[in-house]
């Protein structure tokens, strides 16, 4: 099968990682991430814990990638979005 070109991205507050990778057609999201070498560079990434997506759409590790896809590895949330909204609303009400 021919190779397809995809991107694998992972963003931290201080640095963004973007790798252009060629993988065989029919490869899974997990195979694409492994082929990028990002797991060796950032050992804190745990594919069983971190969610993944393609163009901001959540996908499973076994889903197939297509040419031109951008595979994204998401970091876990550090705060509950509902709590943050509540805190912002309280601060705005005090002003």
Curated annotation (Swiss-Prot):
Signal peptide from the UniProt entry: none
Family to which the UniProt record says this protein belongs: Belongs to the UPF0125 (RnfH) family.
Organism: Erwinia tasmaniensis (strain DSM 17950 / CFBP 7177 / CIP 109463 / NCPPB 4357 / Et1/99)
One Pfam family, short name: Ub-RnfH
Encoding gene (name): rnfH
Protein name in the entry: Protein RnfH
């Amino acid at each position: 099968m021919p190779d397809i070109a995809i991107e694998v991205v992972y963003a931290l507050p201080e640095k963004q990682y973007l790798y252009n990778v060629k993988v065989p057609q029919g490869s899974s999201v997990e195979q694409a991430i492994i082929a990028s070498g990002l797991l060796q560079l950032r050992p804190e990434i745990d594919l069983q814990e971190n969610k993944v997506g393609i163009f901001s759409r959540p996908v499973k590790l076994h889903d197939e990638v297509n040419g031109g896809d951008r595979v994204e590895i998401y970091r876990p949330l550090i705060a509950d979005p509902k709590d943050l909204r509540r805190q912002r609303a309280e601060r705005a009400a005090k002003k």
